[in-house]
């Protein structure tokens, strides 16, 4: 960053004390305080992994991503703050040590001369705190909501999962991973929107949804995947109504996929290069209902490996068979199936951050990961990944009561209101439990 840019940053500099969150990352923290918060997070991660599906090994690369929502994106690694797209060094320090605290959205650095510096993100911006002042990084001043999830057994893990969703919101819209995907996917976008509806962040994707005009995202080799039709209608329902111009186009596409079966009319076509009539029809019905449109379709009684991926409703319309539940390369499949059945057998990453990933996807540009670390590009492994983060978040956020009390059935608020790509403010927002308050924001 040149001198002119840093002059602009200096104009945004503010005294440190008035803007600090009560218990967030600060350059004034003693090293033991930062280590204590990191230890609490790690203890929570251990419990989480024991209760759910353990871990999968991710590369031993310590980094943290800054730039949630529409903000400019940055990578922190080893005393350097990098532009996440170009790899250009924005700031660097000669450090003796650093502590990355993912649930606090921050990093505390100690320099060779004993100065403590913090890079921290909050509901207002990304800040660099040093020498008693903090400066908002240019391009990051945009509001968003960061619930603390206080009272939830896994409040820290939920904060990190939420961050992994928010950091992948781009000017183009919500993407699975901003390094390897330049365009939004309707399926991943719909799952992200379900999570953002819980946390009051739908405004971050509102303009993207309002601007949708195509019934399909055509991201899988240009294919017209019929599950997109229901996903598109559901997305529209979150910010508009049946008069949105995309709705008529979606309805006009339905006849080409319709078939008649013993249970009635349903749709079928190829999603992820295979037919998934149960999954596709469930999404269609979900989208129609979300917009209050007539529904003349019935979920067919057919075996469908994707049936259990749709856990939001119509659970009784399911024929047992072989589920598509790859928990290694496409862990969002396993998490969705676990949500459907109420099982707990899907993993998160073995590192502090990131917790989610996807590997060997056919449409991902893995070469773009070299800016993060060449090992991610070599392994064709993108992390974090929003479908994985959304499935995990939506299962966990309402699966457990606050500390103590009886376990309740999952109550994720995913009922409407009225996939893999493989060739097969400084004050944080409070978070009332979802079983007590149906929707946030």
Task: For the regions a language model picked out, list residue spans one by one.
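Glycine- and aromatic-rich loop/turn segments at beta-sheet edges
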Residues: 158-180, 207-226, 254-277, 296-335, ...
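Low-complexity, Ser/Thr/Pro/Gly-enriched N-terminal "stalk/linker" regions
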Residues: 24-184
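Bacterial N-terminal signal peptides
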Residues: 8-18
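Well-ordered alpha-helical scaffold segments within catalytic/enzyme domains
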Residues: 138-148, 182, 188-201, 231-245, ...
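Non-catalytic carbohydrate-binding regions of carbohydrate-active enzymes
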Residues: 25-62, 68, 300-418, 422, ...
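Aromatic-rich carbohydrate-recognition surfaces in CAZymes
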Residues: 183-190, 196-294
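Bacterial N-terminal signal peptides that target proteins for export
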Residues: 1-7
